[in-house]
Amino acid sequence: MSDGGKTKTTVEIYGQSYTIIGQETKMHMRHVASIVDDKMREINEKNPYLDINKLAVLTAVNVVHDYLKLKEQYEKLEIQLKEKE
């Protein structure tokens, strides 16, 4: 870790190196990068003619969609738990 409790690590996403600085562990940041890389490759398999910018945007849209679906499920579970109390 560097000053201020921040961690710096280099990751590879879709063949490009990125330096990421954050408060999470290197392992966590690498895991996040791996998920992004996997998602980009998954989308590229289905749409091999997309340029890198469109691929990145579609990846972001897909990841946010997945996040929102999980958030909705979490909120429903919270409501169900409160109803049982």
Swiss-Prot record:
Chief location bin: cytoplasm
Alphabetical list of Pfam families matching this protein: ZapA (PF05164)
Xref: InterPro entries: Bac_CellDiv_Activator, Cell_div_ZapA-like, Cell_div_ZapA-like_sf, Cell_div_ZapA_firmicutes
Protein keywords: Cell cycle, Cell division, Coiled coil, Cytoplasm, Septation
Record function comment: Activator of cell division through the inhibition of FtsZ GTPase activity, therefore promoting FtsZ assembly into bundles of protofilaments necessary for the formation of the division Z ring. It is recruited early at mid-cell but it is not essential for cell division.
Gene that produces this protein: zapA
GO process annotations (BP): division septum assembly; FtsZ-dependent cytokinesis; septin ring assembly
Signal peptide: none
Subunit structure: Homodimer. Interacts with FtsZ.
Location(s) in or outside the cell: Cytoplasm
Name of the protein: Cell division protein ZapA
Homology family: Belongs to the ZapA family. Type 2 subfamily.
Coiled-coil ranges from the UniProt annotation: 60-85
Organism this protein belongs to: Bacillus pumilus (strain SAFR-032)
GO cellular component: cell division site; cell septum; cytosol; plasma membrane
